[in-house]
Every structure is written in C-alpha cells, then in structure tokens.
A protein has these predicted regions:
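Active-site/acyl-donor-binding loops of N-acyltransferases
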Residues: 124-148, 289-360
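ATP-hydrolysis module of ASCE/P-loop NTPase motor domains
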Residues: 101-119
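A gly/proline- and charged-residue-enriched helix-loop-helix capping module
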Residues: 77-104
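A conserved beta-strand-loop-helix scaffold within acyl/acetyltransferase catalytic domains
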Residues: 3-54, 58-71, 113-134, 138, ...
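Aromatic (often tryptophan-rich) hydrophobic motifs at membrane interfaces
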Residues: 95-98, 210-327
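Acyl/amide activation-and-transfer machinery of modular secondary-metabolite enzymes
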Residues: 76-85, 133-138, 175-177, 312-317
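Short catalytic-loop micro-motif centered on adjacent basic/acidic residues
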Residues: 108-110, 179, 293-295
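Short intrinsically disordered coil segments
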Residues: 101, 153-159, 331-339
Length: 360
C-alpha cells in the first residue's frame, strides 16, 4: 500500500529522508535533507511531497504549488536549488512516482532533471503524459584514471602553458595557497568568506548575492553546517597572503557531486583565479574514491567551465501527469508554461539591452 502526503515541516522526517537518500535509485544531492531542511526553515510556501510503502519512505521531493496561469505542482525552486530530481527508493522507483502523480489532480513540473539514466526511465514508465519543455546539456566531470593523465589529454600544450603562467604570475603577488575544508574543521570562516567575496562583486552590486537576502544567508549558512556534519560538503579556496581570493563549494551524495557557488576577487580577474580554483578542485575529485560524476550545475555553453570539463550531462524540464489529468488541462499547462518562458526571455533581453545602453 502506497501512502502519499505533503508536509510543510519536514524536520520530523529527517532520519527517514536521510535513510532514503542512502538507498536512492540515483543520488539527488541538491535535494538532500541537509541542504533543503534549512531552506524550509527560512523560506516560505513549500512542502515536502512524500510516498511511503508499508511505512517506509520511498519518495521525497520539495514542492510548491503554482497558481498562475493555471494551478499545478512543481519542484521547489529556490535561490540555492533548481533541481527537480527526487529521492526515490531503489526498489520502488516507478511505482512511487506513479503514486505521487496519481495523487495530483493537476500536472506536475520537474525542472533540471537528468534526461537519461534510471530516473528518466522510471519517470517515463510512471507518467501517463510527459512533455519536454526544455532540454540541454551542461558541463560535467567523470573522474577516471589519474588527474595527471586527464590534464595532459584534456588540454593542448599551449593551454597548459597558459595555466602555468597564470599561476606563476598570481604567485608573484604574494604567498599563494590552495586550501580545502577538512573533516571536523570549523566551516564558519569558509561560509563567511564566500558570502563576503560574492557580495563584494557584481552580484552584490546587482542585489543577487546570497548576502542580499537575510533568509537566503541564514538558509545557506545552516545548510553548509548540516552538510559538513554529514560529510557531504566540499569547499576550496585560493588564498593570497592569508586573504581569500577565490572560493567554491560542492555537495556530495553517493557517487555524485554538484558544484555550488564559485566567486573570486574581481580585482585579480586578469589572473583567472576561478579557473585555477576549478583545476585544483578537479584534482581532488580524482583522488576521492566513489565519485563517478560531478555536475557543474552551470548554464549550457558556460564560457569557463565548458572549456575545462569536456564531459556533458543531459538535462530537461518536463511537465508530467497521471491519467487523472485531462489532455485538455495538460496541454493548457504546457502552452502556458512555454508562453511564460518566452516572455521571461524577452524581458531579460530587454533588461540587459537597457543596462548596456545606460552604461555606454
């Protein structure tokens, strides 16, 4: 018997959720309880959708009801996470998804989900209706062999020489160190350095830095603490004469890892500290046993990471539904979502055009 429910306070099921993550069909680190429960605590309007089989949790996904232009359910998109990949029990993937969809009298939107692999197969099996509203590929790293071999084969000699030159020039500015967060180390300074460095750059000036909203700052801080306590947080920093000039974090779950925020001192941009930090982090992923794929979580065609990590992961945004949802209602939701996305893209282009005109 499959029981479906939604709750606004998932703290009560933290242990069950953590257990589900350990036996998940595929790792879903961006929706881990350590990462998401602090966001529930400090941001409003979301619930945890869950499915149980004989009392055991077999599906967990943070969701939020959307009501315009039509009512439907979607994975919870926050300033920290846009992934709609749920935790699914390895032995109940398709059946749990089917029960979740059947519970809804409206379509369900899942954004930023893998467009191939076991979860995709289970979703196609469970959904009576499925439409892809967007599909893309983004950079990823699949560590295999040694970092040295990867580095030699991934970059031509000219590029390797340029990276050495950048690191040498940066080292000439002072004592350069690459540091990584150690198990049991106090994570608070790492969090503060990332928040402060990001706020000092263009995101701070635009008002989109994590530090621009107190609720986001608090959620991020608590999430990093919880992830670190669970052994699921990775952090790297480039430090020049004791001052952090670039920093980045990642979440890890099972065989997967996902890059989080990366930020750098913009006054040192000519030395490409972000690129150097990515290379240092890449080396550590090659030395970490069990990691088979690192998702960059970057936009497709990203000018930096796409030229460093050559592997790709296929992603998609989809609208799905059970047979309980009429074809008419489903089609209307898909059309409305496509219109909304087109309007958003147009508005963004106009905004950036006005910004460029204002600066010129």
């Amino acid at each position: 018997m499959l029981d479906v429910e939604r709750r606004a306070a998932p703290e009560q099921v933290r242990d069950d959720w953590s257990g589900l993550a350990r036996r998940a069909l595929v790792p879903a680190g961006l929706n881990s309880p350590e990462f998401m429960i602090p966001q529930f605590r400090h941001m409003d309007g979301a619930e945890l959708a869950s499915v149980r089989e004989s009392g055991a949790l077999v599906l967990a996904l943070p969701v939020k009801r959307r009501r315009f232009p039509s009512a439907f359910l979607a994975n919870w998109v926050t300033p920290l996470n846009v992934s709609g990949l749920p935790h699914l029990d390895y032995n109940h993937g398709a059946s749990a998804l089917e029960a979740f969809l059947r519970r809804e009298a409206a379509p369900v939107m899942l954004t930023g989900i893998p467009a191939d692999g076991p979860f995709w197969d289970a979703l196609q099996c469970a959904a009576h209706r499925l439409t892809i509203v967007d599909r893309w590929e983004r950079a990823a790293l699949r560590p295999n062999g040694s970092f040295e071999t990867w580095y030699e084969t991934n970059f031509e000699r000219k590029r390797r020489k340029e990276y050495r030159r950048l690191r040498t020039r940066l080292s000439e500015q002072g004592r350069l160190e690459c540091l990584s967060l150690k198990p049991g180390e106090n994570v608070a300074p790492w969090i503060s350095n990332l928040l402060d460095l990001e706020a000092a750059g263009w995101k701070g000036r635009r008002g989109t830095a994590l530090k621009s909203r107190n609720s986001v700052t608090m959620a991020f801080t608590e999430a990093c603490r919880d992830l670190h306590s669970a052994g699921k947080l990775r952090f790297w920093s480039l430090v020049l004469d004791g001052r952090t000039i670039a920093t980045m974090f990642a979440t890890v779950e099972g065989s997967g890892a996902w890059l989080g925020k990366i930020t750098h001192d913009e006054t040192l941009a000519k030395f490409s500290p972000g690129v150097l930090l990515i290379l240092d982090a890449t080396e550590t992923f090659f030395s970490e046993a069990g990691i088979t794929c690192v998702d960059s979580c970057a936009v497709p065609g990203h000018p930096m990471i796409d030229n460093i990590w050559r592997d790709r992961v296929a992603m998609a945004d989809v609208v799905v539904a059970s047979a309980n949802v009429s074809q008419k209602k489903f089609d209307f939701t898909v059309r409305a979502e496509n219109i909304r996305r087109n309007l958003r893209t147009t508005a963004r282009h106009i905004f950036y055009k006005l910004i460029r005109r204002h600066r010129s």
